[in-house]
Structures are given as C-alpha cells and as structure tokens.
C-alpha cells in the first residue's frame, strides 16, 4: 500500500519532534532544571507556570513536597508489588528524594519547554494514528503507531515519576531508554511506509554482520554513558566540581571511552569499503555523525565536561543509533 507524500513527511515531523524531546530532556538534566516544576502535568498547579516568586503561596515548598510524598508512596507500593522491594525501600529511605527546591524562574521555564516538546510529540503521534485509521488501516502500521502511542503515554507517566522521586538517577535512565524505543519504532514505521528504493545497500554477509555488531556496541555504549551520567549525579550530590569528575569516575567511564575506539575502527572499515565498492549513503552519514560524537566525547573528557557538550554528545549518540537502525532495516529488506 502506498501512502501520500504528505503522510510520509508528517512521519518525519513526528520523528523530529521526538528528537526534540530527547534534546530538551538532555538540556534539562544538564542545566539542573529537572525539578523546575515540582508537580506534573501542571507546573506549580498552572498550565502556564509563574515567572515570579510572588505568584506562589508562602508555603508552596511544603505543599508540593506533600504531593510528591504521596506519589512516591504509590510508586514504591507498585515497585513492591512487582518484586522490587529493595528498590522501593531505597527510594523511601533516601532523604534527597524529599528535598524541595526553591522556585527558580529559569529552571521552571526550561522544564516547562521540555514538557511542551513532549506535548507536541505526543499529539503529533495521536494525529498520525487518527490519519492511519482514516485513510490506510494497514494492520502492521496501525499496530506500530498504536504501540508507540501507548509507549508515549507510559513515557509521560514515567516523567511524572522522575519528578516525584526528585530525579533518582536510574529513573532518568529508564526515561531515556523508553524514548529510544519510541524512536526505534518510529524509524521502523518510516522504513515500512517508504516507497523509495535505497540504492547501494550491500547484500554480503560481512556488511550484515558488521552492521549488527556496530549497532549492538553503540547501544551498549549508550547504556554505559547513562552509567557515567548516574555516577556524575552522585558526585554532584557529594559536592565534587566539574574539574574533579573525570578523576573520580570509575570503570564504566574507561570502558565507555575504550569501546568508542572499537566503534570507530569498525565504522571506518565500513566507510572505506563503502567508498570503494558499495556507495551506500547511510554508511557515510553514520561515519560523519560518529566523528561528531567522538569530538564531543573528547571535549567532555578534556574540557571538564561543559554542559552544552553533554547535550550534544547525547543527541549525536541518538542520531547515530537511529542511522544504524535504518541501515539494519535496509539490510533486512
């Protein structure tokens, strides 16, 4: 079944909006704005958040802490039901969970813009689902879009958990990986509805094996990156400065850095082979994105981890993973 050009372009718009959410979320984390709104889905009880402290009641910190405590209790009860008693206990007994930040207009509006990006992406996906039901109704496409819509709802709900638990690091990691799953499904949908024949896709076993290997290593790299980020969050709580982070980071950081060289070697070989024999454009894109990713990684390691570079590092990693997924989809087709 062939879709209209408008529908195909709209699916790319949905994907870009999801990427915007990843970018905004990374910027929120980098800027320390995650608790800029202490409640969810509203921000300080309003759909449009305040800009001045005078717009809030005198006891706003106590009031929102009480709301968060109730949500934490519900989440911990859920964790206990699914057998994660120790995790629930750790969250309940962690005093940092119950620290309520003072109002900061810059942080509040940074987090609010992040939520607006999520709202736009979610509604674009809902419109996409309605469009499919109205004009196409192909079973596979409807299932993919419906699944992504459900995952987007779960992602939004889990965002409220991240806020309720005062940014417990592992909850932020799950929040990110849910976004990556949503991106993966959207890419698969785009691959399925595309009628364009991809030129130069290598069909030999070496390419298929190497593309799988690079994809898996890159995914593992992103997991290691989240572990490094969680370690940094712990260092921040302990009072370490940016200049001290690198020397305090443990084995995950060194493995993360070492695996980068492995990805570079493998993708450089594919890039060389592609220029010589295949002329498949996505290998070139993956190679250039990896170069940008490695550049930001070096900047993080040797320039005391500047905040905006942290955001760029995650965004390039997400783009690289997406291009590698598209390569795999092309190879399977």
Where are these regions (language model features)?
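N-terminal signal-anchor transmembrane alpha helix
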Residues: 9-34, 217-227
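Membrane-interfacial catalytic/cofactor-binding modules of polytopic membrane enzymes
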Residues: 221-263, 268-272
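Membrane-interface helix-loop-helix junctions at transmembrane boundaries of multi-pass membrane enzymes
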Residues: 132-146, 271-286
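A juxtamembrane structural motif centered on a specific transmembrane helix
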Residues: 188-210, 326-333
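Aromatic-anchored segments of alpha-helical transmembrane domains
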Residues: 23, 150-158, 218-224, 289-299
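Interfacial helix-loop-helix junctions of multi-pass membrane proteins
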Residues: 27-39, 103, 156-176, 229-242, ...
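Membrane-interface loop-to-helix entry segments
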Residues: 109-127, 171-182, 251-266, 310-319
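Individual transmembrane alpha-helix segments
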Residues: 61-123, 252-256
């Amino acid at each position: 079944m062939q879709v209209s050009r408008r529908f195909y372009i709209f699916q790319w718009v949905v994907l870009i909006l999801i990427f915007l959410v990843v970018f905004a979320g990374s910027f929120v984390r980098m800027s320390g704005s995650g608790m800029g709104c202490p409640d969810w889905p509203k921000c300080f009880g309003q759909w449009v958040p305040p800009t001045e402290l005078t717009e809030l009641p005198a006891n706003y910190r106590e009031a929102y802490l009480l709301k968060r405590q109730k949500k934490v209790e519900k989440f911990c009860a859920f964790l206990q039901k699914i057998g994660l008693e120790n995790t629930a206990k750790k969250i309940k007994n962690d005093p940092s969970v119950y620290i309520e930040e003072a109002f900061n207009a810059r942080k509040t509006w940074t987090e609010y813009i992040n939520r607006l990006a999520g709202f736009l992406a979610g509604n674009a996906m809902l419109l996409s689902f309605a469009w499919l039901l109205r004009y196409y109704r192909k079973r596979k496409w409807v299932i993919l879009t419906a699944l992504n819509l459900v995952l987007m709802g779960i992602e939004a709900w889990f965002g409220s958990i991240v806020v309720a638990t005062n940014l417990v690091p592992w909850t932020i990691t799950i929040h990110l990986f849910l976004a990556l799953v949503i991106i993966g499904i959207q890419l698969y949908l785009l691959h399925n509805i595309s009628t364009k024949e991809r030129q130069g896709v290598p069909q030999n076993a070496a390419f298929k094996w190497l593309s799988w290997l690079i994809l898996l290593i890159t995914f593992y790299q992103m997991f290691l990156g989240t572990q490094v980020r969680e370690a940094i969050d712990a260092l921040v709580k302990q009072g370490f400065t940016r200049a001290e982070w690198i020397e305090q980071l443990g084995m995950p950081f060194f493995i993360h850095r070492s695996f980068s060289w492995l990805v570079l070697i493998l993708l450089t070989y594919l890039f060389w082979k592609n220029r010589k024999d295949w002329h498949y454009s996505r290998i070139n894109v993956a190679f250039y994105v990896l170069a940008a990713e490695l550049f930001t990684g070096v900047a993080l390691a040797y320039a005391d981890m500047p905040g905006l570079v942290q955001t760029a590092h995650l965004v390039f990693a997400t783009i690289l993973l997406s291009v590698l997924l598209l390569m795999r989809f092309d190879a399977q087709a």
